[in-house]
Swiss-Prot record:
It is found in: Secreted, Cell wall; Cell membrane. This is Adhesin-like cell surface protein MAD1. Belongs to the RBT5 family. Residues 452-472 are annotated as: Disordered. Residues 1-19 form the signal peptide. It comes from Arthrobotrys oligospora (strain ATCC 24927 / CBS 115.81 / DSM 1491) (Nematode-trapping fungus). Its main location: secreted. The GPI-anchor is attached to the protein in the endoplasmic reticulum and serves to target the protein to the cell surface. There, the glucosamine-inositol phospholipid moiety is cleaved off and the GPI-modified mannoprotein is covalently attached via its lipidless GPI glycan remnant to the 1,6-beta-glucan of the outer cell wall layer. The lineage of its organism: Eukaryota, Fungi, Dikarya, Ascomycota, Pezizomycotina. Sequence repeats lie at residues 217-243, 244-265, 266-282, 283-309, 310-336, 337-358, 359-382, 383-402, 403-420.
Length: 718
């Protein structure tokens, strides 16, 4: 019975593994270094996803209608170096400003003779450009970190809109004639309108009215507003000071000298409730600190002064103190309850004695421990929830307070964690540690060992091989050392950047991404924009074609997205030939170059269908370690990455059709699953959702159904 349950659990683990894969771009796109990729550039920021604040003039766009004629050293927040403001005879596009002025400069090959820069980041959405001669212009954007982004566009003698889809968050932009342009002569370069991407336009705020004597309300991330009333007493009352407030907090305190009823200040989201001076504790809410009302009944002698706890980030304790003549019998107090992101109510003393609060740090504050000189008293612990600390118990002697650290604080002694050893394992559970062998269940289904790659298509069997049962994946072994092909990091970075426009799992889901023309076009433009040079762009796009080779017939953009000025390197071994049918728009004209360069010339275009044969080198994704994926030639078919699991039974032999992998990819240890622990699953990062297109949805559905049947069978057999 036990063996049957273990076998069913192992089979479920195998099925779960078959539905997952490695996100190969993750190591290239880990931003754990302050929002930047460790050792690389920040994540690419397209204008569509930027959040720059714009001036009112930038919100409507620059049309230069209010700029004086002549030199244009500065306009709004920008420095226009090398530009002049002049009149233009060209008709503006609809909705692109008014007037007839433009910012004019010159462009030439190889050098930049103009620059537009700003002291803060900006994102240009679109330029309206006209040239003296039709040319291909390179727009070069300087980024805050010193990197550069560029895009290339062909502009004519009429007003040409130039869209910027890749280079957001820039500090400068300059232009020159691109090397692919037929025109190599220096010519006039006119900007008729600049449209900015403004997701957060700047706004003006109304003046704040003068404050009144009423307590200030508590709002987001604020501290408690406390009213303190001091009633006349035979003895001099102890001075009361409000708690200091720091980041995200402020205490509004009103003090009156006449006894009068007070109402608590209104509290809203993320604030703490101000309460009257009673013996009942004030409630705590999320992101707030407890406002504790303490009634101190002093002895005939003068009471000692009481100082409130300090306020730090996200927390502050405001204490209301009322001094009244009373006998020496101590009054019982109860701690205030603690809730999410709150601090613990303080314990009070039975006699007047100085108390010092525990240090408060980020998201936490330690409940203070007090000294009782008269009668030892204890208090019940206040309930603590998410991100709160524990109320301490009052003891007869003074004790040191436990330090508070990020997200937690414990004021009571805690037991040390005892390291878990193998003695804790039930004696009825067997532990198996194979040398380099692999686990294969007795169903003629070969389960690959723990290695670091992802599944791919089933290779065609040879004449001597036997096929496994229908519906099973077949894998071949990896070479002892995969052949690393050196894919430029710009490709996985761009794939990660633009995956957000799709419904795919992540940038490793190539079977979902490759058929998407918009995605492929955006990635290719991103590679062209952020590639260091043409060689890096060509190499990155070559790998993209290799990754998406099987989808070229259904998505010709995989081939046509390559810029005309970029030449892909020739394919040597392992090449595949794909026939692509594309529709292109080409100009049709018999006019001379002099005529086409005249202002106002409108070219004529026609649509043609082009059929061509493309040779690509398929590329597969293989990982030598879970965090180090590499690209290898497509001739290698790799089994999926499976973390070390706990098989329930151990096979006596390996099926003949399975190939034993080399030592380099064998797991270090394999253990049987404990009865109380669920069957482990493939913990890839990030975990892909269930739905990944039609194929993945079917596999995920079958996995869930199989798991349910297995669980039901296990219960019946048990």
């Amino acid at each position: 019975m036990k063996g049957a349950i273990q076998f069913l659990g192992a089979l479920a683990a195998v099925q779960a593994v078959s539905a997952t894969y490695i996100d190969w771009t993750q190591p290239f796109n880990s931003y754990d270094c302050g929002g930047k990729q460790c050792g690389g550039r920040p994540k690419f920021e397209p204008p569509a996803y930027s959040n720059e604040r714009c001036t009112p003039q930038q919100n409507t766009g620059y049309d230069f209608s209010d700029a004086p004629d002549g030199d244009l050293p500065k306009y709004d927040d920008f420095d226009f170096s090398g530009y002049k403001c002049q009149k233009s005879k060209l008709q503006r596009r609809s909705g692109r400003g008014s007037g007839s002025k433009c910012a004019s400069s010159y462009v030439e090959p190889e050098t930049y003779s103009n620059e537009i820069k700003c002291g803060k980041k900006f994102s240009v959405d679109e330029f309206d450009i006209s040239l003296e001669y039709e040319s291909v212009i390179e727009f070069h954007y300087g980024m805050p970190d010193g990197s550069s982004c560029k895009h290339v566009s062909k502009c004519g003698t009429g007003i040409t809109p130039v869209k910027n889809t890749q280079c957001g968050g820039a500090k400068s932009v300059k232009c020159k004639i691109h090397k692919s342009s037929q025109n190599k002569k220096k010519c006039k370069f006119n900007i008729h309108h600049i449209k900015f991407r403004c997701d957060k336009p700047s706004t003006t705020s109304a003046p704040v009215p003068a404050t009144t004597s009423e307590p200030a309300p508590c709002t987001e991330y604020s501290c408690t507003a406390t009213d303190t009333t001091t009633e006349p007493a035979p003895t001099e009352p102890a001075p009361t000071e409000p708690a200091p407030c720091t980041e995200y907090s402020c205490t509004a305190t009103d003090t009156t000298t006449e006894p009068a009823p007070t109402e608590p200040a209104p509290c809203t989201e993320y604030s703490c409730t101000a309460t009257d001076t009673t013996t009942e504790p004030a409630p705590c809410t999320e992101y707030s600190c407890t406002a504790t009302d303490t009634t101190t009944e002093p002895a005939p002698t003068e009471p000692a002064p009481t100082e409130p706890a300090p306020c730090t980030e996200y927390s502050c304790t405001a204490t209301d103190t009322t001094t009244e003549p009373a006998p020496t019998e101590p009054a019982p107090t109860e701690p205030a309850p603690c809730t999410e992101y709150s601090c613990t109510a303080t314990d009070t003393t039975t006699e007047p004695a100085p108390t010092e609060p525990a240090p408060c740090t980020e998201y936490s504050c330690t409940a203070t421990e007090t000294t009782s000189e008269a009668v030892p008293t204890t208090t019940d612990e206040a309930p603590c929830t998410d991100y709160s600390c524990t109320a301490t118990e009052a003891v007869p002697t003074t004790t040191d307070e436990a330090p508070c650290t990020e997200y937690s604080c414990t004021g009571v002694p805690t037991s040390e964690a005892v390291p878990t050893t193998s003695d804790d394992v039930p004696t009825t559970t067997d532990v198996y540690i194979p040398p380099t062998d692999v686990y294969v269940p007795p169903t003629d289904i070969y389960v690959p060992p723990a290695n670091t790659s992802i599944p791919y298509e089933t290779p065609s069997p040879s004449e001597t091989e036997t096929l496994p049962p229908s519906g099973t994946d077949v894998y071949t072994t990896l070479p002892s050392v995969p052949v690393e092909t050196g894919c430029p990091p710009v490709l996985p970075q761009c794939m990660e950047t633009w995956t957000k426009i799709t419904q795919c799992v992540n940038s490793g889901d190539v079977k979902c991404l490759c058929p998407n023309p918009e995605y492929i076009k955006s990635v290719a433009e991103c590679v062209e924009a952020w590639g260091v040079d043409d060689d890096e762009v060509a190499k990155a796009l070559e790998y993209m074609q290799g990754l998406c080779a099987e989808h070229i017939p259904e998505n010709p953009a995989i081939v046509t997205c390559v810029p005309t000025y970029v030449t892909l390197p020739p394919v040597t071994t392992g090449a595949s030939t794909v026939t692509v049918s594309t529709t292109v728009v080409v100009p049709v004209t018999t006019a001379s170059p002099e005529e086409t360069n005249k202002p106002g010339y409108v070219p004529v275009f026609t649509t043609e269908t082009v059929i061509r044969t493309v040779t690509v080198c398929p590329v597969k994704l293989v990982t030598t370690e879970p965090s180090k994926p590499v690209l290898v030639p497509g001739t290698i078919t790799a089994p999926p990455y499976v973390p070390p699991t706990a098989p329930a039974t151990i096979p006596a032999t390996v099926p003949a059709e399975a190939t034993t992998p080399p030592v380099e990819y064998a797991p270090s240890t394999l253990m049987t699953a404990y009865p109380t622990v669920p069957v482990p699953v493939n913990n890839t990062t990030p975990n892909p959702p269930i739905a990944t297109g039609a194929a993945s949805s079917f596999k995920a559905f079958s996995t869930v159904m199989l798991a349910g049947v297995i669980g039901l069978t296990a219960l019946i057999m048990a």
